[in-house]
Amino acid sequence: MRFVTCRLPDGVEDPAILSQDGTQVWPLSWLGLSYETLSGAIPFLTPQVRAGLQLAIAGIPALPVDAVQLQSPIPCPAQDVVCLGINYMAHSDEAEKYSADAFATKHQDAIYFSKRVSRAVPDGGFIEAHTDLVQK
């Protein structure tokens, strides 16, 4: 069972269940669950609750996914997001062109870093370039 956050046609943002094929959503509010966010729902989505939800969605119509705007699953994380720098070396090589001293040491270990997020950009969403700060 896959959970998403979506903006409904009336503009309300609601956690929802995404169908197996990714073409339909069932807002949790339609199932009588009044969680404002997916973060609020997660602690209560026990295996028993998920099994009950699976039965419930089998009996009610869904919204086509094209009728909603998919958001980030957790649009406003309560904490910093921890990231794994898989492509750290590529960034290091690129940054070394600008400051060889700062990136002269090559790291072989995994690089973790955190990001502050006020609101996560949804899949396919616009990422502001901050052209006043950077050129590329």
Language model feature labels by segment:
Residues 8-10, 119, 136:
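A short catalytic or substrate-binding loop motif that flags glycine-/basic-rich loops and adjacent residues
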Residues 120-134:
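Active-site glycine-rich loop that binds ribose-phosphate moieties when present
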Residues 1-106, 110-111:
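N-terminal non-catalytic cap/leader segment that marks the start of a structured domain
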Residues 104-124:
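A gly/proline- and charged-residue-enriched helix-loop-helix capping module
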